[in-house]
Amino acid sequence: MPPDASHERVSRLTGIALMCGAVACFALLDTTAKYLNLYMSTLQVVWARYTGAFLFPFIVSNPWTRPGLTRTTRPLLQLVRSVLLLASTLCNFAALRYLQLDEAIALIFSTPFFVAALSGPMLGEWVRWRRWTAIAVGFVGVLVVTRPGAAGFHPAALLSLTAALCYALYSITTRILARTDSNETTLFYSNIVGALALLPVVPFVWTTPGDPLVIALMVATGAIGSFGHYLLIAAHRLAPAAVLSPFIYTEIVLVTALGFLVFGDVPNRFTLAGAAIVVGSGLYLLHRERKVRGTIDQASKVSNQ
């Protein structure tokens, strides 16, 4: 095997390992948030998550030494993006108060369908019939999980879908900002906006935890989320997004296991069937995205010859 090919293979495998680590952090974060919801307001949990994530870089290093950390060419878009992420987190954590982990994450995985549908009007990346079909099938999976009109339907499922929509809009604005602002700058604004926005509200809903474990988990939420995002960024520096994206779906396995171990939750047949449809449709979307990008890259090479 040529040295360059060997180096690329090692980089990709390392990137995949980092991606799996990031996904594990996000699964642990959702589990921790659901557990903390038993002892305090969702607003307090979300505030702890963003405040901890903002302070975490100061513990492991001095972020102010990084030149241009706060410099952004699009401050309004940074604010919009940060508010979208905050709204997504609030809706997700609120849904976790009522839904099982596996149900909530299955609905959150509808995010790629929202992204694909919104990329046309917002980014000019129009979706063709194959991907529209995958989107439609994916939402059938969402309906299987939520079962609207059935006895098993819980209104909190709408919170999970709202979280997915907000996260899709957040992802699209992130792609726009990536053209001008660094990852570190974008992370900085996400965390500080979330922490400051909830600060005036938190005193009115504050509950002082008496259990040392609850205090430790409350402090840890920010570190877990922040570390997960750093692993995610590191993974994308080592391997292409098309290689890494399918591993996002390992989170549903992790949260199902954690839901059973921590809360004794057993997924029902509707959640399992719906999750399988959602994951299958999402993987097909990734396959089509990879194929379309490959065709574009090939055409670009030919035109440059």
Indicate residue ranges for each PLM-predicted region:
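Transmembrane alpha-helices of multi-pass small-molecule transport proteins
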Residues: T14, Y39-A87, C166-L169, Y189-V205
